């Protein structure tokens, strides 16, 4: 896992976009993002039991898995959005990026590869993309029934109860 400030270039979203400014694990934790590396699914199972994740599935994001809808899906995942549930992903194979908003609303890029697990809190604005290899396989974990409902960023979503709860959970500057 590699975490850094996004360079804000308009190049292909699947490029590294590494500004060279490293972001610490402590800084991620301050915005509610938890990151782990597990070599064994047994460790994932232990975390799932501890945090009450009852359901899971697997998803492969690649041109061969998604066919003609691949490019549209990758573009949709890259729209800035939030969820009303935690987003938990354990990377089984391949690589990709989660971009999350920092406290000052800039982008932080998290490069994930096999064995990495990330937990995004409900209400955090984020986006996702594969890397330039166009392939990632991930386990998605859920506290309740599997669902993925994005709320794209706009002024109304800024007033969402989960967004407000997330903002109120952040430590003061």
UniProtKB/Swiss-Prot annotation:
Fe(2+) binds at residues 81, 83, 87, 126. GO terms for cellular component: cytoplasm; nucleus. It is found in: Cytoplasm; Nucleus. CDD domains: cupin_ARD. Binds either 1 Fe or Ni cation per monomer. Iron-binding promotes an acireductone dioxygenase reaction producing 2-keto-4-methylthiobutyrate, while nickel-binding promotes an acireductone dioxygenase reaction producing 3-(methylsulfanyl)propanoate. Pathway: Amino-acid biosynthesis; L-methionine biosynthesis via salvage pathway; L-methionine from S-methyl-5-thio-alpha-D-ribose 1-phosphate: step 5/6. This is Acireductone dioxygenase. The gene is ADI1.
């Amino acid at each position: 896992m590699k975490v850094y400030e996004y360079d804000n270039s308009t190049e292909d979203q699947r490029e590294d976009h590494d500004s060279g400014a490293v972001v610490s694990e402590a800084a991620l934790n301050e915005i509610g993002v938890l990151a782990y590396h597990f070599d064994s699914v047994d460790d994932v199972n232990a975390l799932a039991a501890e945090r009450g994740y009852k359901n899971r599935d697997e998803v492969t994001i690649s041109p061969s898995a998604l066919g003609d809808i691949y490019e549209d899906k990758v573009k949709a995942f890259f729209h800035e959005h939030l969820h009303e549930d935690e987003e938990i992903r354990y990377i089984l194979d391949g690589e990709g990026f989660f971009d999350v908003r920092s406290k000052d609303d800039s982008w932080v890029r998290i490069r994930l590869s096999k064995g990495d697990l990330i937990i995004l809190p409900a209400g955090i604005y984020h986006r996702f993309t594969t890397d330039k290899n166009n392939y990632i396989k991930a386990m998605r974990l859920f506290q309740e029934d599997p669902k993925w409902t994005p709320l794209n960023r706009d002024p109304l979503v800024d007033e969402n109860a989960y967004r407000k709860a997330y903002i109120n959970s952040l430590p003061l500057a």
